[in-house]
UniProtKB/Swiss-Prot annotation:
Residues 98-145 form a coiled coil. It is found in: Vacuole membrane. One of its GO terms (biological process) is vacuolar sequestering. This is V-type proton ATPase subunit a2. Keywords: Acetylation, Coiled coil, Hydrogen ion transport, Ion transport, Membrane, Transmembrane, Transmembrane helix, Transport, Vacuole.
C-alpha cells in the first residue's frame, strides 16, 4: 500500500476537497480467457489507472499488437463512412441498442462488405460522372465550333461569286482556310487539318502564344468564351474554360499541337466539318447526356440508401470499435506471467474503490466462464500516488483553476476549498457594481438553466469556456452584487436603498461639500457607502482611502490563510520542522509588519484619528526610537512597535538557519541507526528537500539544502512586501471600473438625454449599452478575472502550495465516444 502520510485527524477540515482521495497500488492477476472482459468491466467502472509494465517494448512487440492493428483498420473504415456520409448530407442516428450485444468479428465482416459495396458504387458513379462531364464539354465544343464553321460557311457562300470572277484575291481574315483549299489548284493543294477542344481560360492566352511560336505562325486559331463554369472530367472541379479550334498544315504541326494541348491540360474532342454530321453528333450527345443523368441519379439514390443503412448502426459500431481498441491498448500494458496463462497488471486506485474492483473482477470471471478467478492484492510502495479529487459540476471549474497552476501533490492541502469563495470575492472587489453584477447573473442563469441542452451541443471556443465556468461566473456575479451594494453603485449611480443619507449639506451646492460642509442629522448609513458622497469633491479621496486600506486588509488576511494552510500540510505530513521553523517565523514576520499595519488601519477607522499611517510604518524602520507625536494611535505604541520590529528581525534567521542543520542531523542519525523518537515524528521533509520521494538512502547534499532554504527565506521576506503591494490592484481596478462606469453614464447617457431629440436619445442609449457590455461586462470582467487569478496563484498559493503532483487518469469508457481518432 502507498504509505500513509498521517491521519490528518483533527487538524484538517473534514472535507472531500481538502485532501485528495487516499490511493493504493493494486495488482490484479487475470487468467487469459477472462482478461478481455475483466478490462472491459474495469473500464466501465473507471477507477483504475494502469501502469505500463511493458514500457521497454515497442508497440509492435506487444501481445495484442495484431488486435490493435485490426481495430485500427476498422476505425479507418468507420472514418471513411463518416466522410462519405458528411459529403452526402447523411446524419448518423443515435442508437439505444447496447453496444455489448455486438460481436467484433461480425462488425468486422459487415464493415468489410459495406466498404467494398460503397467503393464499387463510388467507382461506378465516378466513372459515370466523368463520362457525363466529358459529354457536357463535347456538347459545348459542338455548339461553339459549330457556330464558327456555320459562320465560315455563310461567309464562303457569299464570297464564292467574287472568287470565281477574280483570279487573285486578297486573303481575308474571315475567309476560311478550307474554302481557300478548294480555290487552289488540286495538284498544289496542301493537306489541312484542325483540332477542337477546351482549354482553361487563365491559360488560353499563353496557350495561343505557345502554339503560334511552336509552329512559327503556321496555324489559325479561334477561341470562344463559355459563360458558365464547367466541371473538368479529370479533376472533378469547376473551372472556367474556352472552346478552341486550331487549323494546321502537316503532320509535324499536328504532333506539336497535340503535345502542347496535353501540357496545358486542354481536353480535345472529335469534330466533323460536315454540318449534317454535326447535327447528328449533337443529337447523340444530348440523348446520351439524358441517359447518364438518369443513371447517375439512380446511382446516387443507391449510395444514399446504403449510407443511411450504415448511419443506423454507425454510432453503435464506432463506440464498439473505440472501446475494443482502448481495451487492447490497456491489455498491452499488462505483462504475461512465466506460464503465459495469466496477465499481471498494476495500477493506482482510490482506497474506497477496492470492493467495487473486486466485484468487477468476480463478475468478469463468471461471465467469461473462467475456471480460475482473478487475484486482487494491494502492494506496498514508496512511489508518489496520483492526485484524485471527487468533484461535482459546481466545484469542477474551481478545481480546474487551481490545476491550471499545478496539480496538488498527493494529499497536499487543496487551495480550491477556499478558492470557491475567495476567487469570486476578490473579483467582485474589483468589479463592485450591483447593476453590472445583475447583468452577469442573468447571462449566467441562461447558461445554468439550459445546461442540459447546451452540454449536448457543439459550442465555439469562447462559448465553451464560458459554459464550462458558468458556476464560477455565477459566484462572481453574486459577490459583485454584494460588493456593489457596499460601494453603493448601480451603473455608477448611488441609491439610498437601506435608509436616507446620514448627512445634510450646509449650503445649496452639495457637490462642493467636504466633511466639514456636511451636517450629520441622522443615524449612520446602515450598509455600505453613504450615497451623499457621490458627486462631491471629496468622493474620490474618500473612496480611494477606503478601497486602498480595504485591499491591504484583504491581502494580509489571505496571505495569513496561505501560511495557515502550510501549517495544515506540516501537521498532516507530521513535519515538526516545518511547523517550528517555517510556519511560526513566517506568521511572526508577516503579522509583526503587515498584520500590525492592518490593526492600525482598523484602529484609525474606529477612533477617527488623523494619524499618518505612511509616516508610522516608514519611521518604524528608519527611526524606531523617535516619538510618534500626533501619529500615536494608542498608549505604549512605541514599545509595541519596537517589539514587533525585533520579532520580525529575529524571524528571518529563524527561518534560514535551523532547518538545514536539523535535516542534516536527522540524515546522519538515520544512517547511523540511532533512535531519535522526536525526530522520527518530524520529518518527511528530508525526502522532499532531496527529491528522494521516500528513498532514505540517497546522498544528502547539505549545500543544496542550505541554498534552497536561503532562496526560500529571501523569497518570503521580499514577497511579504511585494505581495502586500500586489493586493493594491484590488483598489486600482475597482477605481478604474467605477470611473469608466461613471464616464459612460455622464458623458454618454446624460449628455444624450440633454438634447430634446428622440433620435439622439436612441443613439445615446445604444452607445451606452454597447459600451457597458463591450467594455465593462466583457473587457473589465476578463481583466478582473485575470488579476484575481494572479492573486491566487502567486500571492496566496506560494505560501503553501507545491503543486508538483500528477492527476489520477483512470482507464474509463466515459469519454471514449467523444474522442477524436
Amino acid at each position: 500500500m502507498a504509505e500513509s502520510h498521517g491521519g490528518g485527524g483533527g487538524c484538517c477540515p473534514p472535507m472531500d476537497l481538502m485532501r485528495s482521495e487516499p490511493m493504493q497500488l493494486v495488482q490484479v492477476i487475470v487468467p487469459m480467457e477472462s482478461a478481455h472482459l475483466t478490462v472491459s468491466y474495469l473500464g466501465d467502472l473507471g477507477l483504475v489507472q494502469f501502469k505500463d509494465l511493458n514500457s521497454e517494448k515497442s508497440p509492435f512487440q506487444r501481445t495484442y499488437a495484431a488486435q490493435i492493428k485490426r481495430c485500427g483498420e476498422m476505425a479507418r473504415k468507420i472514418r471513411f463512412f463518416k466522410e462519405q456520409m458528411s459529403k452526402a448530407g447523411v446524419t448518423p442516428k443515435e442508437t439505444l441498442d447496447r453496444e455489448n450485444d455486438i460481436d467484433l468479428d461480425d462488425v468486422e465482416v459487415k464493415l468489410e462488405e459495406l466498404e467494398a459495396e460503397l467503393v464499387e458504387i463510388n467507382a461506378n458513379n465516378d466513372k459515370l460522372q466523368r463520362s457525363y462531364n466529358e459529354l457536357v464539354e463535347y456538347k459545348l465544343v459542338l455548339e461553339k465550333a459549330g457556330e464558327f464553321f456555320a459562320s465560315a460557311h455563310r461567309s464562303a457562300t457569299a464570297q464564292q461569286s467574287e472568287i470565281e470572277t477574280e483570279q487573285v484575291g486578297e486573303d481575308l481574315l474571315e475567309a476560311p482556310l478550307l474554302q481557300e483549299e478548294k480555290s487552289v489548284d488540286p495538284t498544289k493543294q496542301v493537306k489541312l487539318g484542325f483540332l477542337t477542344g477546351l482549354v482553361p481560360r487563365e491559360k488560353s492566352m499563353v496557350f495561343e502564344r505557345i502554339l503560334f511560336r511552336a509552329t512559327r505562325g503556321n496555324i489559325f486559331i479561334r477561341q470562344s468564351v463559355i459563360e458558365e463554369s464547367v466541371v473538368d472530367p479529370n479533376s472533378g472541379e469547376k473551372a472556367e474554360k474556352n472552346v478552341f479550334v486550331v487549323f494546321y498544315s502537316g503532320e509535324r504541326a499536328k504532333s506539336k499541337i497535340l503535345k502542347i494541348c496535353e501540357a496545358f491540360g486542354a481536353n480535345r474532342y472529335p469534330f466533323s466539318e460536315d454540318l449534317g454530321k454535326q447535327a447528328q453528333m449533337m443529337t447523340e450527345v444530348s440523348g446520351r447526356l439524358s441517359e447518364l443523368k438518369t443513371t447517375i441519379g439512380a446511382g446516387l439514390d443507391q449510395r444514399n440508401i446504403l449510407l443511411e443503412t450504415i448511419g443506423d448502426k454507425f454510432e453503435q459500431w464506432n463506440l464498439k470499435i473505440r472501446k475494443e481498441k482502448a481495451i487492447y491498448h490497456t491489455l498491452n500494458m499488462l505483462s504475461l506471467d512465466v506460464t503465459k496463462k495469466c496477465l499481471v497488471g498494476e495500477g493506482w486506485s482510490p482506497v474506497f474503490a477496492a470492493t467495487e474492483i473486486q466485484d468487477a473482477l468476480h463478475r468478469a470471471a463468471v461471465d467469461s466462464n473462467s475456471q480460475v478467478g482473478s487475484i486482487f492484492q494491494v502492494l506496498r510502495t514508496k512511489e508518489m500516488p496520483p492526485t484524485f479529487f471527487r468533484t461535482n459540476k459546481f466545484t469542477t471549474a474551481f478545481q480546474e483553476i487551481v490545476d491550471a497552476y499545478g496539480v496538488a501533490k498527493y494529499q497536499e492541502a487543496n487551495p480550491s476549498v477556499f478558492t470557491i469563495v475567495t476567487f469570486p470575492f476578490l473579483f467582485a472587489v474589483m468589479f463592485g457594481d450591483w447593476g453590472h453584477g445583475i447583468c452577469l447573473l442573468l447571462a449566467t442563469m441562461y447558461l445554468i438553466l439550459r445546461e442540459k441542452k447546451l452540454s449536448s451541443q457543439k459550442l465555439g471556443d469562447i462559448m465553451e469556456m464560458a459554459f464550462g465556468g458558468r458556476y464560477v461566473i455565477f459566484m462572481m456575479s453574486l459577490f459583485s452584487i454584494y460588493t456593489g451594494l457596499i460601494y453603493n453603485e448601480f451603473f455608477s449611480i448611488p441609491y439610498p436603498l437601506f435608509a436616507s443619507s446620514a448627512y445634510d449639506c450646509r449650503d445649496v451646492s452639495c457637490s462642493e461639500a467636504t466633511t466639514i460642509g456636511l451636517i450629520k442629522t441622522r443615524d449612520t448609513y446602515p450598509f455600505g457607502v453613504d450615497p451623499v458622497w457621490h458627486g462631491t469633491r471629496s468622493e474620490l479621496p474618500f473612496l480611494n482611502s477606503l478601497k486602498m486600506k480595504m485591499s491591504i486588509l484583504i491581502g494580509v488576511a489571505q496571505m495569513n490563510l496561505g501560511i495557515i494552510m502550510s501549517f495544515f500540510n506540516a501537521k498532516f505530513f507530521k513535519s515538526a520542522v516545518n511547523i517550528w521553523f517555517q510556519f511560526v517565523p513566517q506568521m511572526i514576520f508577516l503579522n509583526c509588519l503587515f498584520g500590525y499595519l492592518s490593526v492600525l488601519i482598523i484602529i484609525k477607522w474606529c477612533t477617527g484619528s488623523q494619524a499618518d499611517l505612511y509616516h508610522v510604518m516608514i519611521y518604524m524602520f528608519l527611526s524606531p526610537m523617535d516619538d510618534l507625536g500626533e501619529n500615536q494611535l494608542f498608549p505604549n505604541q512605541k514599545i509595541v512597535q519596537l517589539t514587533f520590529l525585533f520579532l520580525a528581525l529575529v524571524s528571518v534567521p529563524w527561518m534560514l538557519l535551523p532547518k538545514p542543520f536539523i535535516l542534516k542531523k536527522q540524515h546522519e542519525a538515520r544512517h547511523q541507526g540511532l533512535s531519535y523518537a522526536q525526530l522520527d515524528e518530524t520529518d518527511e521533509s528530508l525526502q522532499v528537500e532531496t527529491n528522494g520521494g521516500g528513498h532514505g538512502h540517497e546522498e544528502f547534499e547539505f549545500s543544496e539544502i542550505f541554498v534552497h532554504q536561503l532562496i526560500h527565506t529571501i523569497e518570503f521576506v521580499l514577497g511579504a512586501v511585494s505581495n502586500t503591494a500586489s493586493y493594491l490592484r484590488l483598489w486600482a481596478l475597482s477605481l478604474a471600473h467605477s470611473e469608466l462606469s461613471s464616464v459612460f453614464y455622464e458623458k454618454v447617457l446624460l449628455m444624450a438625454w440633454g438634447f430634446n431629440n428622440v433620435f439622439i436619445w436612441i443613439v445615446g442609449i445604444l452607445v451606452f449599452i454597447f459600451a457597458t457590455v463591450g467594455v465593462l461586462l466583457v473587457m473589465e470582467t476578463l481583466s478582473a478575472f485575470l488579476h484575481a487569478l494572479r492573486l491566487h496563484w502567486v500571492e496566496y498559493q506560494n505560501k503553501f502550495y507545491e503543486g508538483d503532483g500528477y492527476k489520477f487518469a483512470p482507464f474509463t469508457f466515459t469519454l471514449v465516444g467523444n474522442e477524436d481518432e
